[in-house]
Structures are given as structure tokens and as C-alpha cells.
UniProtKB/Swiss-Prot annotation:
Residues the entry annotates as binding [4Fe-4S] cluster 1: C64, C67, C162, C196
Reaction equations catalysed: H2 + A = AH2
Binding-site positions, [3Fe-4S] cluster: C277, C296, C299
Record's cofactor remark: Binds 2 [4Fe-4S] clusters.
Pfam short name (any one): NiFe_hyd_SSU_C
Presence of keyword Iron-sulfur: yes
Annotated keywords: 3Fe-4S, 4Fe-4S, Cell membrane, Iron, Iron-sulfur, Membrane, Metal-binding, Oxidoreductase, Signal
EC id: 1.12.99.6
Protein name (database record): Hydrogenase-1 small chain
Family: Belongs to the [NiFe]/[NiFeSe] hydrogenase small subunit family.
GO molecular function ontology, one term from the record: hydrogenase (acceptor) activity
Record organism: Citrobacter freundii
GO BP: anaerobic respiration
InterPro entries assigned to the protein according to its UniProt record, in alphabetical order: Cytochrome-c3_hydrogenase_C, NADH_UbQ_OxRdtase-like_20kDa, NiFe-Hase_small_C_sf, NiFe_Hase_small_N_sf, NiFe_hydrogenase_ssu, TAT_signal, TAT_signal_bac_arc
Amino acid sequence: MNTNNEETFYQAMRRKGVSRRSFLKYCSLAATSLGLGAAMTPRIAWALENKPRIPVVWIHGLECTCCTESFIRSSHPLAKDVILSLISLDYDDTLMAAAGTQAEEVFEDILSRYHGRYILAVEGNPPLGEQGMFCISGGRPFIEKAKRAAAGASAIIAWGTCASWGCVQAARPNPTQATPIDKVITDKPIVKVPGCPPIPDVMSAIITYMVTFDRLPELDRLGRPLMFYGQRIHDKCYRRAHFDAGEFVESWDDDAARKGYCLYKMGCKGPTTYNACSTTRWNGGVSFPIQSGHGCLGCSENGFWDRGSFYSRVVDIPQMGTHSTADTVGLTALGVVASSVGVHAVASAVNQHNRHKQQLADAGQQSPDNEDKQA
């Protein structure tokens, strides 16, 4: 792969015949995908014109490669622009042409040549059981390779739920002792990008942000970028109105399902899952699981794999009940008023009865018979 890291992104794009207009359009799309607005387009353009491409080392532990499969389908920006122009992806044993001894020589060369300058991207996690022998890369335990690469990295990106939380290979009883990367690398800044897999446009946007601003994006307390993990899927879901109205799918392919009602009762984990699925969507913004008729699995949340069936809801959440009609609300209000009037009438009658008894008692004390008895 190209190791000319002094070339800027803009120079690489121009070398490929990309016009200035197309470059600025790319910067505008990048700003939009990052949620920065059009005002930040000039800053992104300046950064991509003047800053050398950042070398990236991408390594794989226990995983299924779904993060890479997702990343190469990025549309804003395109994965080819990220890989071939925005960054210098010098090592990735899935995408690179080299293999075996040649690949390991490239790995060692990058670590020494760009020590302290490269970004380490980790897909999958290291198993610690049996001295790490459950995952071997380059003839040695993956945990050794991860620590070796992390030592000279400026920052680490933990791609996917595997690297961020452990995922299915860490499911109970976790015989391989699969461990999230932040539990074994504790002296480097780590950006967690969970999801099984993460959204491709989120992956490329995070790289764009780090290249543009020379810093990590703002993170939440769990280490996730707030720009993409700051809200629940439920908060922006197009079926949210049905949730608020108490309109739910009760069984697959019932009339409510055909009407697009809320999937919460079918096990949707959207109310407890932080991700950008309902806003960014997948496949270039075409759709996401809930839009396709299936509830969210909560795959970007820690421990989702050990929380029971995907089709049972975790908790009961009270709804607003906005499905009530004006007549229903009116009858309810009338009932409340009638009840209040009834209670007031009963209370008044009781008070009046008590006053009447007191008056009779007072009158009895002042009667002639009582006066004669007293005399």
C-alpha cells in the first residue's frame, strides 16, 4: 500500500483527477455527516489541503470481520476516499495485498517508522485465556501484537462491540476470556465505536473528524463519540409517535405491524440503545432494522448478548396515552368533575347533619323541662 504519508488528502485527490469543486463538495458532505454544519466546511477543506495523511494500523482479534465489511460500504465519505486518500492504511491484514511474512515485515516497519504518529484501529478483542493462545496472529498471541502496536500509537479506535465491550465471544461463561481492548490497554486514549457492526458512515466520519481536528471527538462517560451515541435510537425513531400513543405490534404480521406501529412489545431495544441508526441509517441512508420491520437488538450496548431473548422486552415503560380522542378526554374530564361534585355533596350533607345534631343538643339543654330539673 502507499506509504507516502507526506502527501495531503487534497493532493491525493487532485492526483486522481478530482476537481476543486468536487473536493469542496466532499468537505461539505463530511461536515454534514459530522453534524458540524456548513460553516465548518472551510476548516475541513483547509485541514485536508494542508495536513499530511495519517498512517493507520488496523489489526484483528476475535471477531467476524463485520466491522471491515461495514466500513468498505461507507458512502459519506466513500471508503475508497478514506483508505486511498484521507488516511494511509498501511496495515490491515484483511484489505492489504501482502500476506504472511511480508505482511509482518510491513507491520514492524510501520511501527518503527511512524512511532507516536499512527492511529491504531482494533477490530475484535484479545482472549486472555491459555496465555492468549485462542487467537494467534503472525505466529504469536494477538494480545502481544495488540500491546506492541498500542505502545507507539497516538490514539486507539475500538471498532465494533467486540473491541468495545466483548460481544458474543465474551458471552457467559466466556471460556476464552475474551476481553475489551480498554481493559488490556490502559495508557492510551481510546475511542469506542460500538455496534455489531457499527454504521459505516459513522466509522468514516470519526476518522475524518480525527484527521481534520487533530483530536478525539467529544466522548461520553463510556468512551463513545457523543455526536453519534448521544441519543437513544428511540428518541429519533419514526415509530416514536405510535409508542407515545400506545399503539404496538402484538404479533408478527398482525394489522398493527402492517400499519407500522411500535415494535417495543416485540422486544425492540430502541428505548435503551444509544446509536445513530434512526438518523444516519444504513446503506447510504436507505433504512435501518426498525424501518425494515424488525426491532432493535441493542447490539451497540454492553452485555446485550447475555440479556435473554431478542423478542422479550426488558422493562415496562409508561406511555403518554396520546391515542385518546377528544370525546374520551371529555368523558374522562366529565367523570372527574362528577366525582368531585358527588364527593362535595356527600361532604356537605355530612356536615349539615352534624350541625343539625349539634343544634338539637343545644336546644335540649335550654328546654323548660331542663330548667325545672335544674331548679
